[in-house]
Amino acid sequence: MLKGFKEFLSRGNIVDLAVAVVIGTAFTALVTRFTDSIITPLINRVGVNEQSDLGILKIGIGRGQSIDLNVLLSATINFILVAGVVYFLVVVPYNTLRKKGEVEQADDAQIVLLTEIRDLLAQTNSNSSGRHEAPGTAGTPPPNYGPRADT
């Protein structure tokens, strides 16, 4: 039972997935800190004046309460940064490698097909006695359609 579990964990797909999750989590934390410490303070300063500390992205709704759109904008920027990096550093290279593998497989299939055609042509040429016949009709006499009308 332990051996089967060890084989399951040692498969390439599981290990790759685990590495991707760990790296993705670490990268998400990095981008979140970048957004929280640099982007959000810059967004908070937009539209702030001396009379109010509410910017254009904070809407006061009374009694000291406000709707803070800065948090939503920061989360959106965070998502776009993570999605962009994952797309350009993981998805694009993966698709490129996958297409390259498909081309190599197609080349192998073409080579096999061309080899079969070559072998069939060589076999046909070695069996031919100067007369070309359709496959499967060797040795059958031509059909007799009776006397020709032009004779």
Curated annotation (Swiss-Prot):
Keywords associated with the record: Cell inner membrane, Cell membrane, Ion channel, Ion transport, Membrane, Transmembrane, Transmembrane helix, Transport
Pfam families assigned to the protein according to its UniProt record, in alphabetical order? MscL
A GO molecular function assigned to this protein is: mechanosensitive monoatomic ion channel activity
The places in or outside the cell where this protein is found are: Cell inner membrane
Question: Would you say which domain of life the source belongs to?
Answer: Bacteria
Q: Where is this region: Disordered?
A: 125-151
Q: What family classification does the UniProt entry report for this protein?
A: Belongs to the MscL family.
Q: What is the annotated role of this protein in its UniProt record?
A: Channel that opens in response to stretch forces in the membrane lipid bilayer. May participate in the regulation of osmotic pressure changes within the cell.
Q: Please give the PANTHER family that the UniProt record associates with this protein.
A: LARGE-CONDUCTANCE MECHANOSENSITIVE CHANNEL (PTHR30266:SF2), MECHANOSENSITIVE CHANNEL MSCL (PTHR30266)
**Assembly notes:** Homopentamer.
Checking HAMAP family in the record gives: MscL (MF_00115)
Q: What is this protein called?
A: Large-conductance mechanosensitive channel
Species for this entry: Mycobacterium marinum (strain ATCC BAA-535 / M)
Q: Which gene encodes it?
A: mscL
